[in-house]
Structures are given as C-alpha cells and as structure tokens.
Amino acid sequence: MLQGHERSITQIKYNREGDLLFSCSKDQKPNVWYSLNGERLGTYDGHQGAVWCLDVDWETRKLITGAGDMTTKIWDVEYGTVIASIAAKSSVRTCNFSFSGNQAAYSTDKAMGQNCELFIIDVRNADSSLSEQAPTLRIPMVESKITSMLWGPLDETIITGHDNGNIAIWDIRKGQKVVDSGSDHTAGINDMQLSKDGTMFVTASKDTTAKLFDSESLMCLKTYKTERPVNSAAISPILDHVVLGGGQDAMEVTTTSTKAGKFDSRFFHLIYEEEFARLKGHFGPINSLAFHPDGKSYASGGEDGFVRVQTFDSTYFENIFE
C-alpha cells in the first residue's frame, strides 16, 4: 500500500521496465515509487491544480503531466525538474507520449467558453522554449470532449474516447477523423488501455461496461458487464485476463462498508467474458488500474488516495477455464 497522496488518485502508470510506478492525484503533486517495495522516490512539484493525467516515455527520461491549472508540464524523471511548461486555455484532461517518444499529445476540456481541443507537440529536443512554440497539430473537437486518449500503431494515428461514449481514430498527417466507432458505448468513456502488442484496447465506461476493441477498425470484439460505472480497465500482458475497477461516481459515495463489494477490482476472462475473481482493498471507487509489464502484479489507485500494489499468487497463473 503506497501512501503519499492527500487526495484521490486520478491516474497511475508503470514505466516500460516496471521498476517505477508513477501516480498523480488531485493534490497537485505527482509521485514516483519503486514498484518492488513501495518506497517513494520523489515528488514532481510545480502544478497549482489537480493533476488529471500523466505518462512516462519509453526510456523513462521524460514525464508528461496535465492539470487543472491549465498547463501541461514535461519533467525530467530522474531530477524532478520541469523541462517545459505549456499553457492551455482550459484544464488538460489527457496526455500521452508517442511510442517513439518524439511526440506527445494532450487534450483540453470544454470549459470557460473554450472548445475541447487535441494538441500534438514535438518533444525531441524539449526545453523551456517549447512553451513558446506552436503545436505541430491542433484539432478542435466540436461534438464531445475527449476523456481518454491513446496513440495508434506507428505513431500515425490517435484514438480518442469521448464524453458521449464515442470513440474515434484521427490521422495525424491529415489532421482528420478516419474511423468512428458509432455508439457502442451509451455513456462517457473513463479510460482506455492498449494490449501489449497494440492490436486491441479495452475501454471503461460510465454505462457499466468495459469493451474490447480492434485498434484499427474500432470493431467491438468483447463486452464485460458490471452493475456500476467502470472507471478503469487494463489488459494483462501475459494472460487472457482483463481487470476492471470502478464504483459509483465520487459524489454519490457514502461511507459504505467494503463488504458491499462495490469497490473491488474485478477480473474477467478476455475471451469468455466471464468474471472469475474479485479483490478487495479500497475504501472508495477505483479510479485507475495498471498491470505490471511482467503481468505478475497489478496496481490500483482509488478515490481514498491510496495506491495498492497486489502481487498474484501461483494459483492465479493456473488455467482456471480448462
């Protein structure tokens, strides 16, 4: 159990090797932890508002964060210093490095008279001058705001999940939408996470389901049904398993006993769509989930401000569907 945030966790992410776990919360300070023993290595101090999103690049050199103080910041992971701070006109809701680490994308909220927009910036030679440079691409979102985002294969596309349940793929060379999912989800998308090989991704939605989609055609492959909104979902890198986390909206939560089972991590079989396990722990909804890159443990971040890292025992790796 990692205790270091004063307010609810908004997102957690492992780096590629899995030795570091990054977490951000509404208390303005993203943290980095040793995933093996839960030791806090440091804090990235500089935001003036709730930090909504973060991502770490392939080489664990740069960290990008987006916050309610209307800035996106790029940090030096090792030294904790701000490399660049980019101002936006509303809260920054999502941010992601591309696989190559040459580009980063972030999106802003529809608020204060501003439309939601998707920005792509070049971060190859990131320094303080980045805040003055124009983004390499800027796409206004007219219909519905972006609530989650992924880079597609070969850094050629961006997949966006929206507040109205829609999913779209954008070609960043043309700057236009190339695929639209239609209305597979009937409510907002809270989270999207790719499979290890990038061919599929799982969505978590307020419509109480998580769905598995093809990364290129946006065809819905599988549906995992629950009784309450799903805040986060992740795909195991080694087994055909999906973990879902959620609960009620934060504002609807009363002090419920954990026995009610509302705030469990729920494991589903990727192919058979069957739930086979639940893990308790959080005293509130789970806001973010991440599998360790080796698939032997996973982490969850909750509305209670804690990050829990849980290691699987040997029985988890036995095929229970034989």
Swiss-Prot record:
Listed SMART domains: WD40
One GO term describing the cellular component: eukaryotic translation initiation factor 3 complex, eIF3m
UniProt entry keywords in alphabetical sequence: Cytoplasm, Initiation factor, Protein biosynthesis, Repeat, WD repeat
Compartments, record wording: Cytoplasm
Superkingdom of origin: Eukaryota
GO terms assigned for molecular function: RNA binding; translation initiation factor activity
Main location class: cytoplasm
Family note: Belongs to the eIF-3 subunit I family.
Subunit record text: Component of the eukaryotic translation initiation factor 3 (eIF-3) complex. The eIF-3 complex interacts with pix.
Job description of the protein: Component of the eukaryotic translation initiation factor 3 (eIF-3) complex, which is involved in protein synthesis of a specialized repertoire of mRNAs and, together with other initiation factors, stimulates binding of mRNA and methionyl-tRNAi to the 40S ribosome. The eIF-3 complex specifically targets and initiates translation of a subset of mRNAs involved in cell proliferation.
Database matches in PANTHER family: EUKARYOTIC TRANSLATION INITIATION FACTOR 3 SUBUNIT I
Name recorded for this polypeptide: Eukaryotic translation initiation factor 3 subunit I
Organism classification: Eukaryota, Metazoa, Ecdysozoa, Arthropoda, Hexapoda
Name of the encoding gene: eIF3i
